[in-house]
């Protein structure tokens, strides 16, 4: 089961406008309508640096194939992940509720549900289980976890801390909340979108496109 938690945050919408106004040696204690207008202006004209003074920290659990899409976002973000070099507890594997078809006119994304017979679904279950059995056998034979992990599938669940600026996470969501994003990745991005919007409502309103 995938999971997204907001662990920590630094700053508020007011922090962003105060970072912008310091250029004129001014700050405010209470957020008002003028501050909203300033945030809107900063976002529309891509003055990104004030938004880098506010940040979010998430803990995320998702399958490897989702994590490897999201880790491509590097600017303004840092990532620390569970390492199978150091741990060898039993892996958890992701299993989809349904299968989606290949789209007709695109190299990415997916279409409607594809019905598979029980044999194929059984083969998937068996293959995943075989990977876990082989992994455990290698460990029992004394193989190092850093090498034994090579037999684990991309459906293996992983966890990571993901921290970054409000601006950086808005860029993630602007790309990964789109309909043509892989659904599983989109599911993670949609939760980030919701939590970030609650933490920084005005910044998020104008940074999200």
Regions inferred by a protein language model and the residue ranges of each:
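Family-specific signature for flavin-dependent thymidylate synthase
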Residues: 1-209
């Amino acid at each position: 089961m995938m999971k997204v938690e907001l662990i920590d945050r630094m700053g508020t919408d007011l922090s962003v406008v105060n970072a912008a106004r310091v250029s004129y040696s001014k700050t405010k204690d209470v957020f008002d309508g003028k501050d909203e207008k300033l945030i809107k202006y900063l976002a529309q004209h891509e003055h990104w640096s004030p938004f880098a003074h506010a940040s979010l920290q998430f803990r995320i659990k998702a399958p490897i194939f989702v994590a490897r899409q999201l880790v491509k976002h590097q600017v303004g973000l840092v990532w620390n992940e569970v390492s199978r070099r150091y741990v060898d507890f039993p892996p958890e594997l992701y299993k989809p509720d349904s299968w989606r078809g290949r789209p007709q006119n695109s190299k990415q994304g997916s279409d409607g549900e594809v019905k598979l017979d029980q044999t194929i679904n059984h083969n998937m279950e068996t293959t995943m289980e075989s990977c876990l059995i082989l992994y455990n056998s290698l460990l029992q034979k004394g193989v190092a976890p850093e090498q034994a992990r090579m037999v684990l599938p991309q459906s293996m669940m992983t966890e990571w801390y993901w921290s970054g600026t409000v601006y950086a996470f808005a860029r993630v969501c602007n790309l990964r909340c789109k309909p043509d994003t892989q659904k599983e990745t989109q599911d993670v991005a949609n939760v980030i979108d919701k939590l970030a919007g609650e933490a920084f409502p005005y910044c998020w309103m104008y940074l999200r496109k």
